[in-house]
Amino acid sequence: TSSKKDYIEIPVSFATDRNDTKDDDLNERFGTKRADLQYGRTVVSIPYTHKLGEIERPSYWRLEFSEDASKHVMIQSIKKQDKETYFNQMAERIAKNGKSTFLFVHGYNVSFADAARRAAQITFDLRFGGEPVFYSWPSQGATTLYTVDEANIEWAKHNMKNFLRDYLTRSKADDIYLVAHSMGNRGLTKALIELMNENPELKDKITEVILAAPDIDADVFRRDIAPKMVQKIAKPITLYVSADDLALIASRKVHGNPRAGDAGKGVVIVKGIETIDASGVDTSFLSHSYFATTSTIIADILDLIKSGKRATDR
């Protein structure tokens, strides 16, 4: 084997309320049970052969049975930190790296390792030069355990609010982007609304909120969540929706009502929130991670983050 690395390493900060399994297998290091908030850094490698929007993984079809850093996106290390060290070092890095950061909150059916790889892929594909951070709540990482995930995102909301307070206060960034996907939107929106009630001054720390394919009841979103978000945050909020989103269509069937991210029954339009219809540009399996896997959406988010331009100007 060559001594030259054929991958790039992306360090990512994390906060999680999953149980620490202490497993030597880094893909299994944090489990599916609830725990107190923990903090740390993970390094994820992305191969030079990486294609925009992909998270390359071993494929049985290609007779790949183990991870290979020259071909696959994989976790290289996970290091826990105490809270003080975590936020102090984060602020130091942000001061050096363009004073910007994003927080990614994943959705349903996602493991800690999935979330780490996704956060690194978003960082790499968006050519984001600031501090990437992800919050991993105890999703079961299984399509069949939807209702367990629903209960756990509701439980995690309190921890998420406390983390957001520290993150907004202590990261010392000039630009903070908050990004939630799928069911993660339930946690982020509720945590933000509660936090803004308690600490309204923190809204000045937020640059933009991106709600990708929210798995939230569309009527509840329109009536209860969106107006409060617009009023309390008073910063740009972008909603990405799609009519092709299979996970949201399935969720609509489970709940009997459309979801806020599902454009199939009409696009959710709310005063003060910019809605981007991503229908028809989606190529991803299960059609649910289009915000991170479709190059046009990546280009749109990149433009949003780099320029702050609104949709009509992009």
Identify the residue ranges that each predicted region occupies.
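Lipolytic serine-hydrolase domain surface
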Residues: 1-81, 85-96, 116-175, 192-208, ...
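Alpha/beta-hydrolase fold active-site loops
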Residues: 100
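Short substrate-entry loop that stabilizes the transition state in hydrolases
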Residues: 110-115
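The conserved beta1-alpha1 loop
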Residues: 103-107, 181, 213
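Gly/Ala-rich beta-loop-alpha elbow adjacent to hydrolase catalytic centers
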Residues: 160, 180-188, 193
